[in-house]
UniProtKB/Swiss-Prot annotation:
Domain of life: Archaea
Name of the protein: DNA repair and recombination protein RadA
Family as reported in the entry's similarity comment: Belongs to the eukaryotic RecA-like protein family.
SMART domains recorded: AAA (SM00382)
Listed Pfam families: HHH_5 (PF14520), Rad51 (PF08423)
InterPro entries: AAA+_ATPase (IPR003593), DNA_recomb/repair_Rad51_C (IPR013632), DNA_recomb/repair_RadA (IPR011938), DNA_recomb/repair_RecA-like (IPR016467), DNA_repair_Rad51/TF_NusA_a-hlx (IPR010995), P-loop_NTPase (IPR027417), RecA_ATP-bd (IPR020588), RecA_monomer-monomer_interface (IPR020587)
Native organism: Saccharolobus islandicus (strain L.S.2.15 / Lassen #1) (Sulfolobus islandicus)
Residues holding ATP: G114, E115, F116, G117, S118, G119, K120, T121
Gene Ontology biological-process annotations: DNA recombination; DNA repair
Gene Ontology terms, MF aspect: ATP binding; ATP hydrolysis activity; ATP-dependent DNA damage sensor activity; damaged DNA binding
NCBIfam families: PRK04301.1, recomb_radA
HAMAP family cross-referenced by the UniProt entry: RadA_arch (MF_00348)
SUPFAM superfamilies: P-loop containing nucleoside triphosphate hydrolases (SSF52540), Rad51 N-terminal domain-like (SSF47794)
Keywords annotated in UniProt: ATP-binding, DNA damage, DNA recombination, DNA-binding, Nucleotide-binding
Length: 324
């Protein structure tokens, strides 16, 4: 038994997997499965198709990877200890951080949804800067990946925010991987390729998708396309969630809203994406415009956060607390 335990401990990379030929390992790497973590969370069917290997081989590889990483049933106490190790990124506003119990969490997908001008993209910019701060200042000393689907990323805004925090502007820019997604297939392919990037660069601690639904809405309009759209969107969101969980990364997605004509009381706006987006993100925050530069953030869904709302401000320097 001790020999078996020692063998598991000796498996550090996919090259150490027992009984797997170099040819198969090369196929796995080419298919984007370059780490034990990505193999452990893969499905046998997906791995078999992507790498061009028999289903039985895929099942064996996944089992070996899971055994090496000690993926098993855990006690509630173990889960509690893992939750205590979750890291957080400050938003720049103490009030908003308080609403989020300390900031944006790693290992979790957080959704910000709201109308145009409600502060979604501003928050994405600010978090891409703040993640680079040292932990004692609310960051993770990490890098960000920014997937822009609407062309709203502005380097000038990053520059202003970095300058306000006294950071070296060129260093901040250099620590943000930016890519413009031109359609849904490109957006999905980018996230597929992210597995390789984050496994090679463990300093990546934030992934932003702004916005996650824009291309899906444009390319799959009408009820006749709804099932296909939701299926693709669901798989896309789960890929992002896996990245968050496997690599201890914070994932931020933004989403638009639409009006519901059948609602005669309360807030008539709802987030785009239907039930798929109601259930996948771990934390859902609605943003609303208020007076001037003030914005309202409200917890819509989060298993560990109480319902509530706070006011914050969009300033020239970035996200800040609203002045009384």
């Amino acid at each position: 038994m001790s020999n078996e335990v020692e063998q598991k401990k000796s498996i550090k990379t996919i090259n150490d997997l027992p009984g797997i030929s170099q040819t198969v390992i090369n196929k796995l790497i080419e298919a984007g499965y370059s780490s034990l973590e990505t193999l452990a969370v893969a499905s046998p069917q997906d791995l078999s198709v992507a790498a061009g290997i028999p289903l039985s081989t895929a099942q064996k590889i996944i089992k070996e990877a899971r055994d090496a990483l000690d993926i098993r049933f855990k006690t509630a106490l173990e889960v509690k200890k893992e939750r205590m190790n979750v890291k957080k990124i400050s938003t720049g506003s103490q009030a908003l951080d308080g609403l989020l119990a300390g900031g944006i969490e790693t290992r979790t997908m957080t959704e910000f949804f709201g109308e145009f001008g409600s502060g979604k993209t501003q928050l994405c910019h600010q978090l891409s800067v703040n993640v680079q701060l040292p932990p004692e200042k609310g960051g993770l000393s990490g890098k960000a990946v920014y997937i822009d689907t609407e062309g709203t990323f502005r380097w000038e805004r990053i520059e202003n925010m970095a300058k306000a925090l006294g950071l070296d502007i060129d260093n901040v820019m250099n620590n943000i991987y930016y890519i413009r997604a031109i359609n849904t297939d490109h957006q999905i392919a980018i996230v597929d390729d992210l597995q390789e990037l984050v496994s090679k660069d463990p300093s990546i601690k934030l992934i932003v998708v702004d916005s996650v639904t824009s291309h899906f809405r444009a390319e799959y309009p009408g009820r006749e396309n709804l099932a296909v759209r939701q299926q693709k969107l669901n798989k896309h969101l789960h890929q992002l969630t896996r990245l968050a969980e496997v690599y201890d990364i914070a994932v931020i997605i933004t989403n638009q809203v639409m009006a519901r004509p059948d609602m005669f009381y309360g807030d008539p706006t709802v987030a785009v994406g239907g039930h798929t987006l109601y259930h996948v993100p771990g934390i859902r925050i609605q943003l609303k415009k208020s007076r001037g530069n003030r914005r309202i953030a409200r917890v819509v869904d989060a298993p560990h956060l109480p319902e509530g709302e706070v006011v914050f401000a969009l300033t020239e320097e970035g996200i800040r607390d609203a002045e009384e």
